[in-house]
Amino acid sequence: ELDKKKLPPIIADGESGFGGIYNVYELTNQFIDSGVSGIHFEDQLASEKKCGHVGGKVVIPTHEYIKKLNAARLSSDVSGVPIIIIARTDAMNAKLMTSDFDDRDSKYLSKNRTSDGYFLIENNHEMAIAKSLNYAEYADVVWCETNTPDLGFAKEFADEIRKSHPNKILAYNCSPSFNWLDKFTKKEIENFQSELSSYGYKLQFVSLAGFHSLASSMYDLASKYKGGNMSAILELQQFEKDLSKDGYTGIKHQQEVGGNYYERIGEALLGDESELLSKKDSTENTQF
């Protein structure tokens, strides 16, 4: 019943692969079975994995991460399902690296080590670009996680990558971890996405947008509803009905959680006239 042309692609967060190359291979296979169109993996140490906007991050050597990208690609090839592989580096803001074995990384490291045995990174800026240049040969899209929405660095990064890989797609996280209100004027915000796009950032997204939207809207609804204000629910339903004109389907919550799917199973097993079927007395069907 679904028109696949209308289904937006899903890009899955593969984190750091949850282990080594075998974990990445199997995880990619499971994502493919689930129907994703793309997966992004980051170059953090899996056992110390953290959000890209907090401290304590540890990145792994370039050669080790490339093996993970190859594991994901092999899984895709064996499955016979082409997917988009996105390489993300956290080197721009990480302070630690597991090893100085890879010469491509060692020049950016201090000789000093932490009490946990990790090497300190001295030049994050150049390391992030260098790592991404190496990753670009093995990934469809390259993403450098940053701790500020800096158009200057975004352009520098893009220029360096596209010197060697002129058609490489770049990704940018317009993260809610950034305090956008304090950093840009209204005019600058209006032009931010088009500026990024002109540099080559064709994949722009807001990580955790769903969380912030859901949390704030639920808080707003509860605040209005408290004290017996039923108009809050009416406003919500009217908002949903207006969105339905543009393809929004969430107003039918039974449908969204699989009601139609199980109804079809019930029809096959019980018959169309069974009194146990849910659609006959469904308020969702009669009122929406």
Which ranges hold each PLM region?
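Alpha/beta enzyme core
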Residues: 1-172, 176-178, 182-205, 219, ...
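Substrate-binding cleft of secreted/luminal carbohydrate-active enzymes
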Residues: 194-223, 229-263
